[in-house]
């Protein structure tokens, strides 16, 4: 199964509890489709350059997923219907990077 890098931005009005619920719901959806969440990162509440759907900030999250292409297509379709997700980007990658991403800071911090 190929790996995917799935970044999404959630609405600024979500509480930390609601954001955790959203992430757990997306993870449960992946598992239901036979996919696997390999890695999850929360990058924080960051400012937008321009407003998106009347939001000036958003919760940035990154998921690394191992899934079949058909399952990933269905996952993207369902995420598109979720009103709490403002934007998302899904890319196929060769492997999941080890350690923390640049957005999280280096491992030496």
From Swiss-Prot:
CDD domains: bS6 (cd00473). Keywords: Ribonucleoprotein, Ribosomal protein, RNA-binding, rRNA-binding. SUPFAM superfamilies: Ribosomal protein S6. GO terms for cellular component: cytosolic small ribosomal subunit. Coiled coil: none annotated. GO terms for molecular function: small ribosomal subunit rRNA binding; structural constituent of ribosome. Belongs to the bacterial ribosomal protein bS6 family. This is Small ribosomal subunit protein bS6. It comes from Anaplasma phagocytophilum (strain HZ). The lineage of its organism: Bacteria, Pseudomonadati, Pseudomonadota, Alphaproteobacteria, Rickettsiales. The gene is rpsF.
